[in-house]
A protein has these predicted regions:
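Active-site beta-strand/loop architecture of penicillin-binding DD-peptidases
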Residues: 1-37, 59-139
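Short surface loop/edge beta-strand patches of beta-sandwich-type extracellular domains
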Residues: 37-45
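Stable alpha-helical elements in mature extracytoplasmic
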Residues: 1, 47-54
């Protein structure tokens, strides 16, 4: 999922995610820097830009934003004064015993992806929580 969202954050160009920018060996005085690895171009620049705009509204739209805190009148996910492009998701969890899906309130897989700053993202964070013990609308 993280790799797929790199295409949205990079104007349609999918990159291999980098978790570490560089590794420094202070004893040897050397630095090894990660190189950008292009995987493909699955979406157009326009589609990526429009998707990011829709993702901004997920956190900023008071009526339809699923990650907008109506009681406080602000986005749930905030990073300084930056607009954050976000998308949340909920999925069913298979029940291995019955071959069907679990049906309890907390028997779900919840996820959120955030890109900051939304116009030209430098960072993407993708978090999943499977079958949370407790739950509220603010994650």
């Amino acid at each position: 999922m993280l790799r797929a969202f790199t295409a949205i954050s990079n104007n349609g160009i999918m990159l291999e995610p980098q978790f570490i920018k560089q590794v420094a060996d202070t004893n040897k005085g050397t630095v090894r820097t990660a190189k950008k690895e292009v995987i493909g171009k699955p979406v157009s620049k326009q589609a990526a830009s429009e998707t990011r705009n829709y993702m901004i509204s997920v956190g900023t739209d008071p009526e339809f934003g699923t990650l907008y805190n109506k009681s406080e009148g602000s986005p749930i996910i905030q990073v300084g004064n930056n607009d954050v492009a976000v998308k949340s998701g909920t999925a069913q969890v298979p029940d291995e015993k019955t071959g069907t899906y679990k049906v309890g309130t907390n028997e779900t897989l919840n996820s959120v992806v955030a890109m900051v700053p939304s116009e030209d993202p430098e960072y993407i964070m993708y978090v999943t929580v499977q079958e949370p013990k407790t739950w509220n609308n603010n994650f």
